[in-house]
């Protein structure tokens, strides 16, 4: 089983327009959809589609409209009650392919709810092969929340394997605390890998796009040296790199028509973890990771 912790989930609304978006004018939507979002939720959805057991832990009131959206995708849930509603992230798409995103403000999650999220994750982890901690953090949650959560999980379930996918300040806090709170796997993109090691992530990505992966491998090895067994770097069309202290593997997707990149990295993570849970080799796990992300 795979357990996901998503501290800052979202209702992802997509509005499709037949015409170009013009600020200050009235538009009629061609279509509108609402789905459950958030990095951990996306991982849980992918695991569910693979017919594998999982539990998604997240904050939400019982009557929050986000909850039935998660139930609609058949994900088993464990919620921690909060007072404020889950945020809505809105994407406006035009026929030209241009998109405009408006991300909502996350709810307030107080200290009591923060501890309950960690407790719920620890309890679910007793029967799990992996725990995934993923996404941004909502209001009221300190940037070192994942550090605290990893330490707590190591105490309650010392043999559990932990995967982390975050960015910005939470990633910087992890980087500062790897000696005491290292996850087993970190799944950054190029920019986030740069945040981890204090390098220019954009330069790492650009080099990889040109076929030079040496910088990404060297940066990932710095993370390995601090106790992270697996660094799974997703690089878009350039594929994905899996780096350990003893080896590095590259997998590239076949040419495909990109419909949407939303959740691609989360699906890649799900594919890798499912393969590992099934006892596949690292090379096979990376291959499945890229297949899921495509």
What are the roles of these predicted feature ranges?
Residues 221-222, 226-237, 245-294:
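Conserved post-catalytic alpha-helical subdomain immediately downstream of the catalytic base
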Residues 101-103, 130-136, 188-190:
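Short beta-strands and strand-loop turn motifs
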Residues 1-23:
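Positively charged, low-complexity intrinsically disordered leader regions
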Residues 115-119, 143-151, 214-217, 251-256:
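Charged helix-capping and loop-helix junction motifs
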Residues 91-127:
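Conserved phosphate-binding/catalytic loop of the ribokinase/pfkB sugar-kinase fold
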Residues 45, 88-92, 239-243:
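Short beta-strand scaffold segments in enzyme catalytic cores
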Residues 27-87:
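Substrate-binding N-lobe of the ribokinase-like
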Residues 147-246:
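Conserved phosphate/ATP/ADP-binding segment of small-molecule kinases
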